[in-house]
A protein has these predicted regions:
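Residue-level hotspots at or immediately adjacent to binding/recognition sites across diverse folds
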Residues: 1-275
């Protein structure tokens, strides 16, 4: 509540063993959190985390939620790994108080061995006021808008490879990062950028310095990305990246107001950068 100076650690009573991988905070008292798997949960608080209400539960075998995204304080979406060959998608239109699953026959079809990574909560992003874009990895890696599927020129072919995160500058300019999380220092096909709404993707001349699990657009031509072995920044729309830290993080997010970027990593580590 004070811009990251002080932190209060908490465990949600009754959900001590749940692996929560994504959070959306609307203000200092209201937030929703996503627990990933079997059963998958979404909880909501209106008192700053003192108490939580269960607003979504799915016990389907194989259910695995990957990320949430919100267009505003009312409309949101959650995406999960494929069930019966279709990606799981649910929507909320009341700020996360209730969620409705999209019928399976209307959900995007997944290729064999294709899934999403719950590494940073950023494999789905709002694209326009009504559309979202999401990315996949595994044996094959795609970017998808509704049922339009575009193959990504990222490393793939294994369960540990592919796209992990997408950031959107505008409806035409997107950046996708990933790699192979089992080879954290490899820069092979670990980032791409599109300037034409996904029709084509360009590899950097100088890529990030390893596997990257999260990317965020900052301003103008500046983007920032992080992974297990450090943090990189580009000031030329992804043509060249420079390593600015060897400290590894799973996720980074730009504050909704101001010029602060927050990082989170293993072992309860939190970082902060003012840009």
């Amino acid at each position: 509540l004070d811009g990251g100076t002080n932190w209060k650690w908490m465990t949600v009573k009754g959900f001590e063993k749940t692996d929560f991988r994504d959070i959306e905070a609307f203000d200092k008292t209201t937030a929703v959190i996503m627990g990933i798997a079997e059963p998958a949960y979404i909880l909501r608080t209106i008192d700053g985390g003192d108490t939580w209400q269960l607003v979504f539960e799915n016990k389907t075998k194989g259910m695995f939620l990957d990320a949430m995204e919100f267009w505003n304080e009312q409309a949101g979406i959650v995406i999960g790994d494929p069930i019966n060959g279709h990606f799981f998608i649910a929507r909320t239109f009341d700020g996360g108080q209730s969620w409705q699953g999209i019928p399976e026959n209307l959900s995007p079809v997944a290729d064999s061995g294709e899934a999403c990574f719950a590494s940073s909560g950023t494999n789905i992003r709002k694209l326009t006021k009504k559309e979202a874009v999401f990315i996949t990895g595994g044996l094959v890696s795609h970017v998808q808008v509704r049922n339009k599927k575009i193959r990504l020129p990222l490393i793939d072919g294994k369960e540990t490879t592919g796209a992990n995160s997408i950031a959107v500058k505008n409806k035409k300019t997107w950046m996708v990062v990933g790699g192979d999380f089992n080879t954290k220092d490899s820069s092979t096909k670990n980032a791409v950028i599109s300037f034409d709404g996904g029709k084509t993707f360009v590899l950097p001349d100088v890529p990030p310095t390893g596997y990257r699990s999260c990317v965020e657009f900052l301003k103008k031509k500046q983007w920032i990305t992080c992974g297990l072995n450090g943090v990189d920044i580009t000031n030329d729309d992804g043509k060249t990246f420079s390593n600015i830290s060897k400290e590894g993080f799973h996720v980074l997010r730009k504050a909704k107001k101001g010029k602060t970027v927050y990082f989170a990593g293993g072992g309860g580590r939190i970082g902060k950068m003012v840009w």
